[in-house]
């Protein structure tokens, strides 16, 4: 017996192909629901016993499906049918002359034209379409997109996308199964350290290290998904770095003054350092060290100057850390060197002196701009506004809110998130910054939790990709404008088509 393939070629019947196809479908179901070897052999025997010299490959597949259905192997049948459909779509994708021509023209444009000449190279504003890695990424994206349409979705969805009725965002990442945007919980990463896959990073102990690791966390996460990376409470997460830096500066400054005044024989430096280790805020006064100076005016002045200088040094170092953070996120590469990380940060509600110092210096660094004064594209910054925190003149962070207005007037960022709005306020719990709504790079917010209402928080949350519907197209089609305009809008037809697309 010979088998007629879809292209008309004749090949000898090969029973192993039936066996392999059914066994592939078997692998996807539980063992007790799989077609047995005897059942597979019966199908093979049935085909071989047919009194035919030639048989179409589609007829063999129909026989397999009918037998699986008759013997109640429903899950195996579903897997086999899906495999058959995917193979059919793949053949159509790569044998359809019109589609193949369009695909090859796209690749031709990527290879032979500049971004100024080719729209495909400008599809993503965060990718330099003229760079080697940018072009390589777009080659891969186009191939992956065609693979997704051929193997991972029904033909009607792929056709609707190609015809412009819908737009399936990030289709080139469909095959990878990655998430879109994510709110990174830096607290977990900082406390235990983390690995980027090429080595483990220890817990940071200075505001410079905190800002560097925050940028690295964003860059690393960018390589694990296709969307944007966001930090939901930047000020809260980096505040401990300010305190650690202050304590380090205070130890060094006091020791330097003691050396300068030649007081090492009269002062127990180790005891002073133990007291500094207990400090839990940068808001300390000279009274904290009273037991060390007692009646010595010289020692009292020494501690006063040390506290003042340490605060100044910490503030300056925090500014430098924020400046480095902004520059890093606008220069460090991710995704094979084709993009800078698409990043967002939320801040503005930490009223501690450490958190306020982070917020203030980040906005000042953003206001200063990049090397030649350019407006930083990233990170997208969102200032969280809350009555009792920063909205009214009597609120502790009101000065930072005013600074955000000044910076945004010059740099377009920060934007503002109003925590007292009707769709944000129900989630807010005083004293728990995790319940403050934060926004991601794609401008979305995720905080509600229908599975566990006790975990309605922002850190660690994210989303999947989106599909847009071309409302103007169906509006024009059923409306009173355009070359096929109706005398009266067909609202019923509009909603019927909208329902179908949804």
Q: Model regions: which residues?
A:
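Charged, amphipathic alpha-helical regulatory modules used
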Residues: 1-110
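Conserved catalytic cores of very large enzyme subunits
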Residues: 89, 96-502
